[in-house]
Amino acid sequence: MRFIEEFINKGYFHQCTDLDRLTAITKETKIAAYIGFDCTATSLHIGSLMQIMILRLLQQHGHKPIVIIGGGTSKIGDPTWKDEVRKILSKEDIAKNAEGIKKSLSKFIKFGDGKSDAIMLDNAEWLDSFNYLDFLRDFGSYFSVNRMLTMDSVKLRLEREQHLSFLEFNYMLLQAYDFYYLSKHYNCSLQLGGSDQWGNIVMGADLIRKISGKEVFGMTTPLLTTSSGAKMGKTAAGAVWLNEDLLSPYDYYQYWRNCEDADIVRFAKLYSEFTQEELNRFESLAAEDINAAKKQLAYELTKLCHSEQAAKSALETAVKIFEEGQIDENLPTVVLEQEVLQAGISAYELFHEAGLATSKSEARKLIRGNGAKINDRLVADENMIINTNFLLDKKVIKLSAGKKRHILVRV
């Protein structure tokens, strides 16, 4: 199966500047294509997983993936579909975040000097040295303000009478220049991104065409939500991070294990590397087979992101907890100072400290709703004092929020 065919078959396709021509070119030759990522955290989360799998697919078909870290543009902020001005990051924050993002990406693609090896670039390399007057002189005449005002991302802010600074308005010019720079210096002929980036991508392709006459393309992916309408990458407990220092492989496994029934087939197509035969089986699941399919999906996605050993460990932990009722040492762990436990801490405070509730009031609500357990026993009193007497084997306390979120408290 060719790149574009598989791209469409997996559900990645939304829009392309010239799909027929791009299909023909990618059949005949290998291209360089780029995707940009925000540099706003020390890890990517599953909201970026489709873009990451596209980079992986490019590489598998012999094309060269280029990853752009927006070290330059992160200093400004992208107004695309944002209701508020974004926090501007320091150089130190950007450098730390870029390191973590490369760690996320390296789980899925190979970086190096080979023809199809990925490279990662920071657009600060060319944007930081920009002379504003030179930019206006050399590129300003190629951009139409009339057209920029028609971009949906800008129109949204204006229609809501929300503040749109000149700083943010310039973002689309800089993204267009990124594409031009990569086309000129890295022979990049394709920019990929979410459908909310369509306007910015087209502006870049137009800029290249006007200046150099090169044939380049833009292609976008659909914006994904779960079947219930929730945004991919976010849960009530926080983001589903790819790096294990922010989210344990067990919690990553549990996210996919607990996905909604209606999402199983779509997630399998988008995020796994199951064969077509396996995908066909997913599409014809009987009701009694859904749980087994979720386990298989969670295992495969955890293996892909972390390792086969991590997937096995997560599966074993889940079996011990949910099927055998045991405590497993591989559960996510938080450390509590021994002095705190010796003095005693109220149940609601402990659940908040352990991260099973985002606030103390939420912890109280959890306990009042009979959703909290300590060492598998229901917590009836939110003010109950938890001390060293609750330690199992003098080592840990098991906390549970609902049926699927568990954590060990160690001292």
Swiss-Prot record:
SUPFAM superfamilies to which the protein is assigned, alphabetical: Alpha-L RNA-binding motif, Nucleotidylyl transferase
CDD domains registered for this protein in UniProt: S4, TyrRS_core
Residues the record lists as binding ATP: K234
Position of sequence motif 'HIGH' region: 39-48
EC number: 6.1.1.1
Keywords of this entry: Aminoacyl-tRNA synthetase, ATP-binding, Cytoplasm, Ligase, Nucleotide-binding, Protein biosynthesis, RNA-binding
Subunit annotation: Homodimer.
Family: Belongs to the class-I aminoacyl-tRNA synthetase family. TyrS type 1 subfamily.
The protein, known as: Tyrosine--tRNA ligase
Gene name linked to the record: tyrS
